[in-house]
Amino acid sequence: MHSVSLIKRKRAEPPAQLMNKCIIIGKIEKAFQLFKDEGTQEHLMYNGSRLYATTIDVTRVSGIVDKITVAIPEKLYTETISERIIVRGSLRTFNDSRHKLILYVLAESISPANDVHDTNLLTLSGNLCKKTVFRKTPLGREITELLIANNQYDNDGHSIPSYIPSICWNANAKAAEAYSVGDWLLVKGRIQSRVYEKTNDSGESVEYTVNELSIGRIIKYNRPIV
């Protein structure tokens, strides 16, 4: 089986990592399995290590469940992982062979959650890489959609950019509507999953789940935040 590495380009002396920290506490939906490109079935790797992935169910106070893909390096993998876990890591994305953007948490550590409440927190900095889209939902809520670029580096100095689909609401949405491509942003929020229906080539209605960053706080800066 061939492997595909999440590596794009290399710099001799990589700059400091941009801010990208998250903590996820929830229930494992299924056992960890090798993380693969669903189109090619190639293994995904990071720092020379194969990745294993699963879905974590995180329940909001409202009762809505967010399903979050979590990937761990092989060195963290064990078949005896607790049913509920604490994951600390960073939010990453990649485009698979089907041109589908995959959003996942790359774990730096995992531990049993025991009686700890479900948690879904993310702090991230990056620059706006696409013009914002402001609109109103059918229920009249104002939202702005953003695409935030966050660059990280592996142990060999290879650049690994992630492009984070994000959404902000109401007053934040009005402020973000005026942002320009290239603006540096610091955001805090949570990773949410959203189900929508799409008609396939056969005319059938199929449900899809997408993940995005739901922003609770957003600040514009004139420099990168590390």
List PLM regions with ranges:
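Single-stranded nucleic acid-binding surfaces, predominantly the OB-fold ssDNA-binding core
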Residues: 2-226
